[in-house]
């Protein structure tokens, strides 16, 4: 969720809805797949707002003692960061929203400068018990300059 929020801010987008999904291996006995969605009161790219919205969704679909093969988040109904339609029941004033945006930009800047995860959200845990396997990661020649093939004549 944290990386999805960072990506939204980097692309100058806000999400008005989000979906959380999980599934076990389809090849293992007791296959399980589930998803849950929610609409946000206001479109947002604020990590704290998105984590708060995701928490009840995860609680609803998570099944303990089931090894997950895949889990993810979908940000939906994306809107430009420059356009924000507000309404009367806004939980934050415009000044508070600007302060939150400044905080998110500062956190992103620190994490870019000192490495991803330098500043973390407490709810995400300090030491994850697992890490994504990346030993067979495909090259991303279309999206990363470092992965472009070098041709020598």
PLM feature spans:
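Basic, low-complexity intrinsically disordered segments
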Residues: 1-153
């Amino acid at each position: 969720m944290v990386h999805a929020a960072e990506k939204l801010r980097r692309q100058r987008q806000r999400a008005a809805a989000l979906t959380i999904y999980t599934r076990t291996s389809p090849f293992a006995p007791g296959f399980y797949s589930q998803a849950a969605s929610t609409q946000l009161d206001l479109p947002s790219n604020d990590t704290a707002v998105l984590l708060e919205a995701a928490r009840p969704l995860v609680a609803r679909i998570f099944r303990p003692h089931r090894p997950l093969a895949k889990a993810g988040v979908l940000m939906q109904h994306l809107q430009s960061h420059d356009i924000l339609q507000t309404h009367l029941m806004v939980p934050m004033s415009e000044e508070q929203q600007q302060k939150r945006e400044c905080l998110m930009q500062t956190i992103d800047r620190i994490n870019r400068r000192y490495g991803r995860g330098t500043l973390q959200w407490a709810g995400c845990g300090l030491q994850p018990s697992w890490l994504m396997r990346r030993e067979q990661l495909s090259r991303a020649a279309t999206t990363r300059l470092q992965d472009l093939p070098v041709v020598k004549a």
